[in-house]
Amino acid sequence: MTEQLQPLRGMKDLLPDDYKVHDYIINKARDVGVLYGYKQMSTPIVEYTKVFNRSMGESSDVISKEIYSFLDKSNDCVALRPEFTACIIRSIISNRLQHKLPLKFFSTGPVFRYDRPQAGRQRQFHQLNYEYIGAKGAITDADTLKLAVDILKALEIEQDTTLELNSLGCNESRRVYQQKLVEYLNDFKEQLSEESKIRLSKNPMRILDSKSETDQKIIANAPVLSEYYTDESKEYFEELIQYLDILGVKYSINPRLVRGLDYYCHTAFEFTTKKLGSQSTILAGGRYDGLAKIMGNNDDVPAIGFAAGIERIALMREYDVSEVKPVFVLPIGKNNICYALEIVDKLRTENIAIIIESLGKIAKRMQRIFNENAQFIIFIGDEEQANNNLKIKDLKKEEEYIVDFAKALELLKK
């Protein structure tokens, strides 16, 4: 018996009904982005693995456990993209776009992470991604956060989310804080999870993201980053809060919300929900002024961005997405097919969606049409063909018309 082929675990087909919802979400988000001056771009799905090694760090979960990385036939180490930000920065550098900064880019498409599949968390999933490159200051961060809010509003889920906000401060703030954090965690070194023991020497701030219950109990009494803000960091965060209040953006300050990579600074944020269980983050982002230099640019480039999971958004509510219902053309006999094809072609040039049903018995063809919830059927038999007429049945109104092409066009375009 021939093996029945299946998709890879954690990778799902997007069937028409799913794709319809995805398309709706993307279009809504794109339209909001346009109002903020964002332009769409795309990058390859496959990049050199070093693009992500540099951006995410070799000790990160994504690089150490989740990335789809392999040698291609040229013996180059390449990877399926696990996120967009590194790809966008790489593109700006390789296309020498630095002189055009600031730039606002919107991207969307699949990303890949080898993780345990569950609802709202697949190995191939789709993201909306926004990057504001080359602009610094709290006003830029406020504008970016308002964009995120407006996207969630357009998708009718903003009311079910909470904006969790924190400041990572400047480099000096984080340097001092990291020292204090290590001093505190060293007292609990033997109690930390094995993963956190490794992170303690490599990237201690990542321990704050640990999912281990034991680690969480230890972290609960750890020093808080805000205690070590410089005057500059305090002023930056206070300015951001002022702008958000003016814009009417509601937020909850979460002092434990951090990013474990050195190139992140100042603003970090997540929009979370209680509707999706453990997969509570819908949209997340932050400021990453140091990434471009790490990736080979001569200088730091100020930047802020965020990504949102399309599958998770789709789980938040049911979207009743309307779609164009095609008109069905049904030639009665084989000798009516040529005339039917002419009619179909003429109607399509008038931007009317048409499907010709010419295969099988009339009853079966009619059943297929009923299954599509069509409104109009055009019957073409010998009489219609001889008189250059069309018989149109309106299934909703339960009315029937025999009209010429011009009248048919008028009826179908109503």
From Swiss-Prot:
Q: Which GO terms describe its biological process?
A: histidyl-tRNA aminoacylation
Compartments, record wording: Cytoplasm
CDD domains associated with the record = HisRS-like_core, HisRS_anticodon
Note the InterPro entries from the entry: aa-tRNA-synth_II, aa-tRNA-synth_II/BPL/LPL, Anticodon-bd, Anticodon-bd_dom_sf, His-tRNA-ligase, HisRS-like_core, HisRS/HisZ, HisRS_anticodon
Cellular component (GO) terms are: cytoplasm
**E.C. no:** 6.1.1.21
Keyword Lipoprotein: yes or no? no
* Reaction(s) this enzyme catalyzes, per UniProt: tRNA(His) + L-histidine + ATP = L-histidyl-tRNA(His) + AMP + diphosphate + H(+)
Which keywords has UniProt assigned to this entry?
Aminoacyl-tRNA synthetase, ATP-binding, Cytoplasm, Ligase, Nucleotide-binding, Protein biosynthesis
What Gene3D superfamilies is this protein classified in? Anticodon-binding domain, Bira Bifunctional Protein, Domain 2
Q: Spell out the Pfam families in the cross-references.
A: HGTP_anticodon, tRNA-synt_His
User: Which parts of the chain are coiled coil?
Assistant: none
Q: Which GO terms describe its molecular function?
A: ATP binding; histidine-tRNA ligase activity
This protein's major location comes to cytoplasm
NCBIfam families referenced in this protein's UniProt entry, alphabetically? hisS
Q: Which family does it belong to?
A: Belongs to the class-II aminoacyl-tRNA synthetase family.
Q: How does it assemble?
A: Homodimer.
Q: What name is this protein filed under?
A: Histidine--tRNA ligase
Q: Which organism is it from?
A: Rickettsia rickettsii (strain Iowa)
